[in-house]
Swiss-Prot record:
GO terms for biological process: defense response to bacterium; killing of cells of another organism. The lineage of its organism: Bacteria, Pseudomonadati, Pseudomonadota, Gammaproteobacteria, Enterobacterales. It comes from Serratia plymuthica. Major component of a prophage tail tube. Antibacterial activity against Gram-negative bacterium E.amylovora. Keywords: Antibiotic, Antimicrobial, Bacteriocin. It comes from the Bacteria. This is Bacteriocin serracin-P 23 kDa subunit.
Length: 22
């Protein structure tokens, strides 16, 4: 499992990827 900090960074990155798609 990833540390919490990395998990949130990954969610943040996914959010940017989603915005780039939309």
């Amino acid at each position: 499992a990833l540390p919490k900090k990395l998990k949130y960074l990954n969610l943040f990155n996914d959010g940017f990827n989603y915005m780039g798609v939309v």
